[in-house]
Amino acid sequence: MNVFGKKEEKQEKVYSLQNGFPYSHHPYASQYSRPDGPILLQDFHLLENIASFDRERVPERVVHAKGGGCRLEFELTDSLSDITYAAPYQNVGYKCPGLVRFSTVGGESGTPDTARDPRGVSFKFYTEWGNHDWVFNNTPVFFLRDAIKFPVFIHSQKRDPQSHLNQFQDTTIYWDYLTLNPESIHQITYMFGDRGTPASWASMNAYSGHSFIMVNKEGKDTYVQFHVLSDTGFETLTGDKAAELSGSHPDYNQTKLFTQLQNGEKPKFNCYVQTMTPEQATKFRYSVNDLTKIWPHKEFPLRKFGTITLTENVDNYFQEIEQVAFSPTNTCIPGIKPSNDSVLQARLFSYPDTQRHRLGANYQQLPVNRPRNLGCPYSKGDSQYTAEQCPFKAVNFQRDGPMSYYNFGPEPNYISSLPNQTLKFKNEDNDEVSDKFKGIVLDEVTEVSVRKQEQDQIRNEHIVDAKINQYYYVYGISPLDFEQPRALYEKVYNDEQKKLFVHNVVCHACKIKDPKVKKRVTQYFGLLNEDLGKVIAEGLGVPWEPVDLEGYAKTWSIASAN
């Protein structure tokens, strides 16, 4: 099956200029004023090549710079129509093509892909109704739950601003941030086990981490979290093996996936949701909006709904992997809403914004990002996924700007009443299409709409009962933040895994230059398990001085919540 519609090229390939005309000289020849003389400014072939070379690089991703990916096919195996009216989740057997990108988080594009770091796992599905993205990680939790902390957290994971050394040489700022923000302990407990060094991209899982809200045709809300689980199970490397590969084979994971697909293997993942009703959310021990917590499977079991099959390598890495742009805004299609998770709320802005910086204002017009119902090139040719299958042609009023090469032709850039230019309105939760959009809106129509929205908000706002319309607020630390990571360390990890965990932490934290930070690392883990803190102190060669959470906060706090 040829998902992306590649055609065999039958025409001769002729070396040409950028204008398409053949170049009649040797590609390595330059115009000189005389043999062994200076070159001429009129040599536009040379100038064109040098100018193009000078502009080959685009800004690398500020996070998730190191990565690779491939094409895929999604299939819906079980309908979710009872909890969402989102079109791709309705009919069993529905299939669509897509693309996936795997990555590390903190490192630059040249760093090893086996480094101890979360893995980004982002999917783009080319549905008939538009592009649908999942922007996930291979860990079900994250380091923080306050969106404002994300930029400074990433700063701490990158190079020291004075020495310009990264965490392979100096881990001081890495641990300084983490130990001053103890909500990170769950992610760290997960990541410094062997789960932090997956054996391959095809043998690791992916999680939304965030809670989303699915809405069904009756308007009922259901909180969901997505899980994408490898069909082969979760396979890991030891920390020592991952470190060895970082030096001997820094592109290990990329090589492995490329070779698997080249050899005809088609790794598969199974897709699940956990569901939580609003009533369950009000009784849940933790906030449904807390990115540092998981939902226990006993209370909220996995419900399968689909499969993802990795199908083939891309034709050009830059065009399809470097230029692909994911965003959680594309997760929130009709039938799926964002939760009040502040990190998710910030990502809704940050992801499209960074793509505009990295790729330009019209990044969504690039072939790899263009929806099928906007004439996506990947849906042409002999592909079974054609633009003609789309139920409607997508139109909006966004126009012009740099590199705009799909500018909607003669379509009006406003709500028009001219012949053959009337926009249709499609009800998001059914197949109704009407002429609802008009240039004139009566005040009474607006009032009816506002009342309906207020009623929906009252019915669906289950978690946050705001008394004022703004709070300056920092999530505080409490004993609850240590319950789940403590269970992970004490009950899930066996004795051998606990030894490896200590080994991994000590090998990483021993590169801390500041003795105060090194001491704090031992107390940080001591809050999780006192014996763990003590053995890490022994490994780091620092005195063991246990403190409770209140003492830890008093010793290391730098400011009040406001």
Curated annotation (Swiss-Prot):
<dbReference type="GO" id="GO:0005739">
    <property type="term" value="C:mitochondrion"/>
</dbReference>
<feature type="active site">
    <location>
        <position position="137"/>
    </location>
</feature>
<keyword id="KW-0479">Metal-binding</keyword>
<comment type="subunit">
    <text>Homotetramer.</text>
</comment>
<dbReference type="InterPro" id="IPR011614">
    <property type="entry name" value="Catalase_core"/>
</dbReference>
<feature type="active site">
    <location>
        <position position="64"/>
    </location>
</feature>
<dbReference type="GO" id="GO:0005777">
    <property type="term" value="C:peroxisome"/>
</dbReference>
<dbReference type="InterPro" id="IPR024708">
    <property type="entry name" value="Catalase_AS"/>
</dbReference>
<dbReference type="Pfam" id="PF06628">
    <property type="entry name" value="Catalase-rel"/>
</dbReference>
<keyword id="KW-0560">Oxidoreductase</keyword>
<dbReference type="GO" id="GO:0020037">
    <property type="term" value="F:heme binding"/>
</dbReference>
<feature type="binding site" description="axial binding residue">
    <location>
        <position position="351"/>
    </location>
    <ligand>
        <name>heme</name>
    </ligand>
</feature>
<dbReference type="InterPro" id="IPR020835">
    <property type="entry name" value="Catalase_sf"/>
</dbReference>
<dbReference type="GO" id="GO:0042542">
    <property type="term" value="P:response to hydrogen peroxide"/>
</dbReference>
<comment type="function">
    <text>Occurs in almost all aerobically respiring organisms and serves to protect cells from the toxic effects of hydrogen peroxide.</text>
</comment>
<keyword id="KW-0376">Hydrogen peroxide</keyword>
<keyword id="KW-0963">Cytoplasm</keyword>
<keyword id="KW-0408">Iron</keyword>
<dbReference type="InterPro" id="IPR002226">
    <property type="entry name" value="Catalase_haem_BS"/>
</dbReference>
<dbReference type="GO" id="GO:0042744">
    <property type="term" value="P:hydrogen peroxide catabolic process"/>
</dbReference>
<dbReference type="Pfam" id="PF00199">
    <property type="entry name" value="Catalase"/>
</dbReference>
<comment type="similarity">
    <text>Belongs to the catalase family.</text>
</comment>
<dbReference type="InterPro" id="IPR024711">
    <property type="entry name" value="Catalase_clade1/3"/>
</dbReference>
<keyword id="KW-0349">Heme</keyword>
<dbReference type="GO" id="GO:0004096">
    <property type="term" value="F:catalase activity"/>
</dbReference>
<dbReference type="InterPro" id="IPR018028">
    <property type="entry name" value="Catalase"/>
</dbReference>
<keyword id="KW-0575">Peroxidase</keyword>
<dbReference type="GO" id="GO:0046872">
    <property type="term" value="F:metal ion binding"/>
</dbReference>
<dbReference type="InterPro" id="IPR010582">
    <property type="entry name" value="Catalase_immune_responsive"/>
</dbReference>
<protein>
    <recommendedName>
        <fullName>Catalase T</fullName>
        <ecNumber>1.11.1.6</ecNumber>
    </recommendedName>
</protein>
